[in-house]
């Protein structure tokens, strides 16, 4: 496909407040995943992946355990998924995924992020068609052809594979996440995955420069401050 996938990982939270927000987001997501699919990670693969991801992001064990206990204890909040789409400052496409126990509040909070930065919130489907919902795996390596052949031998469906600066990136349909991960583990038992996630990969990028770049960063910062926002996907290409 000739796409260049840039993984933008936020640096480790530098303030206690930022860390608490990360813990809260993971706690909410783990709670809902366990409540809907069961609290046993061996029986709920989505939960198993989520817990693994939380540990990689240095979420403390007590935060994870509390979310699991809450899910098995009955009662508790009933969060719903909410997705908002639109165009960020500079015209970049954006998808905002939330978990909320009050849809009206969340919509107003997210809407203010758009309004105060000159962005435009749209209707469902406004931006989603500009992304591919994919499973992405990234790890160190130098022979993408060998990896592709190994995955094909395991009957894993791969849509693209790239090699850049000693890093291999594998793209697959989002429904193939666990199959591809299992195939990689079978073929390369000692492989360390630097990235393993289901995400929205932009089909193309929109350059965002100058004042728009400043507004775009403010837009992201405001969304990050929203307690109900879980993930933000965009296709902005910012200057270094």
Curated annotation (Swiss-Prot):
- Specify whether DNA-binding is a keyword of the entry: yes
Which GO molecular function annotation, any one, does this entry have? Answer: DNA binding
Keyword rRNA-binding: yes or no?
A: no
Q: Which Gene3D superfamilies match?
A: 1.10.10.200, 3.30.70.980
Reading the lineage from the top rank, the first entry is: Bacteria
Q: Which UniProt keywords apply?
A: Cytoplasm, DNA-binding, Transcription, Transcription regulation
Set out the biological process GO terms recorded for this chain's protein.
Answer: regulation of DNA-templated transcription
Q: Which GO terms describe its cellular component?
A: cytosol
Q: What is its main location?
A: cytoplasm
Task: Report the subcellular localization.
Answer: Cytoplasm
Sorted alphabetically, which PANTHER family does this protein's record hold? TRANSLATIONAL ACTIVATOR OF CYTOCHROME C OXIDASE 1
| UniProt similarity note | Belongs to the TACO1 family.
Q: What is this protein called?
A: Probable transcriptional regulatory protein VF_A0150
């Amino acid at each position: 496909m000739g796409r260049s996938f840039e993984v933008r990982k936020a640096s480790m939270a530098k303030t206690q407040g930022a860390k608490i927000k990360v813990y809260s987001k993971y706690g909410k997501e783990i709670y809902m995943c366990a409540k809907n699919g069961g609290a046993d990670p061996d029986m709920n693969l989505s939960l198993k992946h989520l817990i693994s991801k939380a540990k990689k992001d240095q979420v403390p064990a007590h935060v994870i355990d509390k979310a699991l206990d809450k899910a098995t204890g009955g009662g508790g909040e009933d969060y719903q998924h909410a997705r908002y789409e639109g165009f960020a400052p500079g015209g970049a496409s954006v998808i905002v995924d939330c978990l909320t126990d009050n849809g009206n509040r969340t919509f107003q909070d997210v809407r203010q992020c758009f309004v105060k930065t000159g962005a435009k919130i749209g209707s469902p489907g406004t931006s989603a068609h500009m992304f591919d919902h994919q499973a992405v795996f990234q790890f160190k390596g130098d022979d993408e052809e060998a990896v592709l052949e190994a995955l094909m031998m395991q009957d894993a469906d791969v849509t693209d594979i790239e090699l850049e600066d000693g890093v291999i990136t594998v793209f697959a349909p989002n429904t193939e996440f666990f199959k591809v991960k299992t195939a990689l583990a079978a073929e390369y038992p000692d492989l360390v995955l630097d990235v393993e996630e289901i995400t929205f990969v932009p089909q193309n990028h929109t350059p965002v420069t100058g004042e728009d770049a400043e507004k775009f960063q403010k837009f992201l910062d405001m969304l990050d401050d929203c307690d109900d926002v879980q993930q933000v996907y965009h296709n902005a290409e910012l200057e270094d």
